[in-house]
């Protein structure tokens, strides 16, 4: 289950719990997406399905998220979308790892690790695996290519598994 961590821990914990009950085998915590990236193709095609209420059912069906709403999404879709858009932007720190461990029994994978020191710190904190990723360059399209960071991340990770996913030709 890939978690885009909301500001409210209660919402995150509810999503994680539901993922466990649904049979997911790992928690992938996305670190490389605080805001939506600059995507020229999406802008040209007005491709933002979330702004029309699509692909948000995990949130709209979540009892804790619904508790943030004054009316159910079926009655006030725009307010539900606005609430969804406003719950992100909280940057996780290493101090949040114990909370994540408490929130799940699943293995934890940190997605967005692109520096050897971060891989080493993740291993030291008992993280189960890391994704060397810049979200395909779609979120941080001005950053260093993850492929260039991969050897250092692998070295820093030691025996911890390292996964890789990112744009190779273009993030846009």
Predicted regions and their residues:
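A beta-strand-loop signature enriched in Asp, Gly, Thr, and Trp
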Residues: 119-172
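Active-site entrance/lid segments in N-terminal catalytic domains of soluble metabolic enzymes
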Residues: 1-124, 136-139, 148-151
């Amino acid at each position: 289950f890939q978690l885009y961590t909301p500001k409210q821990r209660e919402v995150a914990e509810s999503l994680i719990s539901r993922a466990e009950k649904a049979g997911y085998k790992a928690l992938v915590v996305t670190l490389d997406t605080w805001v939506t990236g600059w995507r020229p193709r999406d802008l040209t095609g007005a491709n933002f399905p979330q702004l029309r209420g699509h692909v948000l059912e995990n949130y709209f069906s979540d009892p804790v998220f619904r508790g943030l709403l004054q009316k159910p999404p079926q009655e006030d879709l725009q307010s539900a979308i606005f609430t969804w858009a406003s719950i992100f932007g909280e940057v996780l720190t290493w101090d949040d790892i114990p909370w994540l461990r408490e929130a799940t029994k699943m293995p934890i994978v940190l997605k967005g690790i692109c520096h050897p020191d971060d891989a080493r710190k993740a291993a030291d904190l008992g993280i189960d695996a890391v994704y060397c990723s810049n979200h395909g360059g779609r979120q941080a399209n001005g950053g260093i290519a993850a492929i260039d960071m991969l050897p250092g991340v692998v070295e820093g990770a030691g025996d911890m598994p390292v996964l890789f996913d990112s744009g190779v030709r273009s993030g846009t």
